Amino acid sequence: MNGFSKLMLGTVQFGMRYGVANTTGKPSFEAAKSILKAAYDGGVTALDTAPEYGDSEELIGRALSELGLSERFKIVTKIPKLPAGCDAEKFIAESLEASLRRLRINRADAALLHAEVDFPYLDVLKSMVGRGLIEVAGVSLNTASHRDDGDVADCLQVPASLLDRRFDRCFGKGRHVFVRGAYMQGMLLMPEGKIFIPEVVERRRKLEKLGIPMAELALRFLFSKPGPKSILTGVETVDQLKENVRIAALPPLDENDLRKVEETAFPELPEMCVSPSFWSQYKKLHNIQ
């Protein structure tokens, strides 16, 4: 797998309102188009999308076509959770073909099983390489219970951040890793009073003592991970995109700062604290509205 930029643009925001820190909502078509142009100009030529991200795929296809950049980006899409009892090969092939039509491309650079429970169908997805629909196949992981499943995948998407270390063992194994959740859906960057998880507040206070802006620290830490990787960030504005590009041009953390960051990860926080998928459970458990 070659050609994936170190910074990757997440596009769920193009299709729906997303993220606990999102204050601007879904961008307009013209705004999203401007973000894509700014991404290309800034060397961010990898995109992450999925059929379940509203009209994200359609928007990308139209915008890149109008910009004349359809062949300039590496695009990763996903296969929705397979319905029980379906013909897996037929479902996966039809899903990919529909995504390619929406994206206005002939082949996706990578496709991931969106639901980790569908991992047994990875070989079926891999067979789509032979059909010319995708270049490589992988899986998007979400929970620690499935982290060992990815060892046979050509590529992985995993959540990771300054506080989420569940998938550290997935790095440095030669395959490409797409990393999402760098800012924990924006929670790491929110005003302290708006963070509803005290454990996150406590850890962030320790990280702030390093004297490095939190957004910068979050990305530079992930760029310090071993092996080939792309750090996925979603934005709602061109200015946010340009700031991420600026940070991506900075060097990884030095050994001293990296050691201090590592120290904040122990003891490891419960999955309920670091994974957005479990935040509704956290709120219910702690009676948070």
Model feature map: region roles:
Residues M1-E71:
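N-terminal binding-site loop/beta-alpha segment at the start of enzyme catalytic domains
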Residues G3, G61-K74, L100-R104, V129, ...:
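Acidic (Asp/Glu)-rich catalytic clusters
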Residues F4-M8, T45-A46, E52, R72-K78, ...:
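Structural preference for beta-strand elements that scaffold enzyme active sites
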Residues L9, A39, L47, I60, ...:
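Conserved, mostly hydrophobic/aromatic
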Residues T24-A38, G85-R104, L141-D148, A218:
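Short, acidic/polar
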Residues A50-E58, L82-D87, A115-P120, S161-D168:
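Acidic-and-aromatic substrate-binding clefts and catalytic sites of carbohydrate-active enzymes
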Residues L100-P120:
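Active-site groove signature of glycoside hydrolases
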Residues L113-F266, Q281-Q289:
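Beta/alpha (TIM)-barrel catalytic core signal, keyed to glycine-rich beta->alpha loops juxtaposed to Asp/Glu
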